[in-house]
Amino acid sequence: MKLLSVAAVALLAAQAAGASIKHRLNGFTILEHPDPAKRDLLQDIVTWDDKSLFINGERIMLFSGEVHPFRLPVPSLWLDIFHKIRALGFNCVSFYIDWALLEGKPGDYRAEGIFALEPFFDAAKEAGIYLIARPGSYINAEVSGGGFPGWLQRVNGTLRSSDEPFLKATDNYIANAAAAVAKAQITNGGPVILYQPENEYSGGCCGVKYPDADYMQYVMDQARKADIVVPFISNDASPSGHNAPGSGTGAVDIYGHDSYPLGFDCANPSVWPEGKLPDNFRTLHLEQSPSTPYSLLEFQAGAFDPWGGPGFEKCYALVNHEFSRVFYRNDLSFGVSTFNLYMTFGGTNWGNLGHPGGYTSYDYGSPITETRNVTREKYSDIKLLANFVKASPSYLTATPRNLTTGVYTDTSDLAVTPLIGDSPGSFFVVRHTDYSSQESTSYKLKLPTSAGNLTIPQLEGTLSLNGRDSKIHVVDYNVSGTNIIYSTAEVFTWKKFDGNKVLVLYGGPKEHHELAIASKSNVTIIEGSDSGIVSTRKGSSVIIGWDVSSTRRIVQVGDLRVFLLDRNSAYNYWVPELPTEGTSPGFSTSKTTASSIIVKAGYLLRGAHLDGADLHLTADFNATTPIEVIGAPTGAKNLFVNGEKASHTVDKNGIWSSEVKYAAPEIKLPGLKDLDWKYLDTLPEIKSSYDDSAWVSADLPKTKNTHRPLDTPTSLYSSDYGFHTGYLIYRGHFVANGKESEFFIRTQGGSAFGSSVWLNETYLGSWTGADYAMDGNSTYKLSQLESGKNYVITVVIDNLGLDENWTVGEETMKNPRGILSYKLSGQDASAITWKLTGNLGGEDYQDKVRGPLNEGGLYAERQGFHQPQPPSESWESGSPLEGLSKPGIGFYTAQFDLDLPKGWDVPLYFNFGNNTQAARAQLYVNGYQYGKFTGNVGPQTSFPVPEGILNYRGTNYVALSLWALESDGAKLGSFELSYTTPVLTGYGNVESPEQPKYEQRKGAY
């Protein structure tokens, strides 16, 4: 279907608006469409019925992965992620936009460089990946403030409500962000097909109006005013029906919800609690939104991990390949057709962008690791499932039925959900009745087929389901005109090539399977041993039974070749689409899917294309890898791998075979301990000579924070003064009267924060932090103070990000950072006058390239010494491995060169060692803050930094702040640069984002 012209879209939008109901909300006009059909007038490219979306009139399954571009600040690597997601068999990515990174100052929207959205859109289009845009304004996402910029703490209104001050505060951001998204809509030739207004608008409390339909409508109208014309889709936090179509004002076009059924108990990864596998999603969908396709906008693909947690490898163990097998097939049993996995690639909470409930890594235990690696078994297992769905269009029109036990199998230990096709083609999802069972269960299937009701296996042997496993058995499955009456082995994919068809089946270890094909032809084994294979004719069908083997067998029945694989072997197979022209595949359609070939290629196959007689494969390798091409196009004569011609042979079955040799290159990394380290005391504020006259006076008698009243004479909430990120430093001046004996202070910086206090140059003590503690009370004994003498209390606080705001009305995002209360014995609280600082300039932040959150308030940060080429020549020598002999904060900087080989993707890590002392460190790499280490809290000790932030062939600048919170000081036990397996890659060059070097900052103090 043709794209609508800009004029046509404008005209139809005007018609739709003219037919709408208008009413007023706090001075703003709300547009409510009384008839959902009116929304269709905005565009006719993305449509839907009760079963699925249609794009350009073709029914489509959206298999999607969540990716946040802001968690990988190297735009030239975004295409790498899209390649790896497309290789899974996915066709879509969902993404958040983080408001806090784009409007650090009210009214000053900046989306440039690493924050620009257009390169993300361009990369998606090049990879042939559709996009679901989720700009918020609230996103949650385990980011600081849930995506709300810190200055919203000063808004005199309830967040995520119809309060006018809040709505006005969002207008500029949404107008700009949504406009950028609008330009990338499919109606403009871009990849964006759906738009999600708000995010998990699913809970309220505390007397605030919730749900507020007018608020939701306002959010949608903001997007429409910015020229968003694609359908609105929601992500209710649970299947509760909020804002579902037909619910009136604030209703979205398509209802969707989230689900994290296994939770986040990464400390106990083998525990699958009773009752956590959903079994009622289909029923709820029919109750809540029966006219729209069943949509899971966020389904668990990993888990977050808090400070002090067990680490993300444990989170992967919790949500691993067994989870994906059981839970994702269960989701398919409900007929899901928009299916987004959160997260598919997690990334990194660099530059203070995370919330206090998490640390620097946002690996999430995702299918793709933080280092963009695809070696996790979950990645491969999901690839098998996604390619099956892609090859099975009849899934989208099959009708899910009720969960059963004892109906389709001969045992009550198994449960089966059928999806019955209106035309031939049904699917039977089998799992353990006790979904967490780790037992292997033998069974026979009882299936209705076109050949009658059958008990399977019909030949010898029994079927088995291993523990924590699930299968989809197909019945009357169409392989280009050949009817697969049933298969107990799972389908990976099928293709029709010139002269024959190929069906790829796989099974688990020690399993027996059976396949029936409607055919009058005989069974011929054309590759592999016939050991363990039996076959017979029965009526107009042939039946084949076999034991799963790690050795491939190929059987031929007529023009159908059936590849019999074990699951681990199937992991090495890929199904790239061949572009009709050029080298990019374009968006998937039934036509492009039919053009696919099947390739066995090991670690990663990014894509394939045909150039005359040359078949080109673009792939990555982490070992010497045999390559096979199944279904090479007619006319293809030569094989090229990553641009290099590769010799190949062709066997009797037409399969091309070649091999890529892998020889790991020599990787030479500098010893960080041997660098020429320079040291600077970055806490000069405790010295008697320090001048804080340029600092902000904390003299507001009232806070603008409506959430928490003051317990101090003037506000000491950092956001009242424009400081929202990183370290905070306070200096309190008073004149002693000689009666002071102790000082009490309550500080707040979010979970796992720390604080330290000095009186003049005398260290009083620290709150060293705990994973559970968002704030801390400390009382410090004072020596006799001299009456009439001026004293200064210096307080350093680690702000680990602002809280999220999930529940409307709780206003948790407004939980302040800084000093909540204090008491100096013998003095009135007003006797102390305070000054404070955070990042230089606060909301007028200095580094526009790295954004508003990257820097905190340390002296070295305010000066910009964490950037490349600091003026360190005159600094004294000193290493973080020598550290500090007393409490304080040191700053260390050094440089080193890298010369890593081109054509290799080499994951690099900065490792701090397992040091449990009360010390905190910040890691800066070429000016980007890429790690916050907290020894006594943990768990993260290893910090991956991607190419682009690190210059793999050039000079790099590394800086560390080291904060000793105990009286005996602190040092790093170790500090090393390491790597893991180099990957020979066909990706191409990685371009570094801007890395502004040090320049003297005007007004720096």
UniProtKB/Swiss-Prot annotation:
Any GO CC annotation of this UniProt entry: extracellular space
Catalytic activity: Hydrolysis of terminal non-reducing beta-D-galactose residues in beta-D-galactosides
E.C. no: 3.2.1.23
Annotated disulfide bonds: 205-206, 266-315
Glycan attachment residues as annotated in the record: 156, 373, 402, 453, 478, 522, 622, 760, 777, 805, 914
Signal peptide boundaries: 1-18
Gene3D superfamilies (alphabetical): Beta-galactosidase, domain 2 (2.102.20.10), Beta-galactosidase, domain 3 (2.60.390.10), Galactose-binding domain-like (2.60.120.260), Glycosidases (3.20.20.80)
Main location: secreted
A GO biological process held by the record: polysaccharide catabolic process
Keywords, ordered alphabetically: Carbohydrate metabolism, Disulfide bond, Glycoprotein, Glycosidase, Hydrolase, Polysaccharide degradation, Secreted, Signal
Subcellular location: Secreted
MF terms in GO: beta-galactosidase activity; galactose binding
Residues the record marks as active site: 200 (proton donor), 298 (nucleophile)
pH dependence of activity: Optimum pH is 4.5.
EC top class, as a word: hydrolase
Family: Belongs to the glycosyl hydrolase 35 family.
UniProt function note: Cleaves beta-linked terminal galactosyl residues from gangliosides, glycoproteins, and glycosaminoglycans.
Name of this protein: Beta-galactosidase A
Organism ancestry: Eukaryota, Fungi, Dikarya, Ascomycota, Pezizomycotina
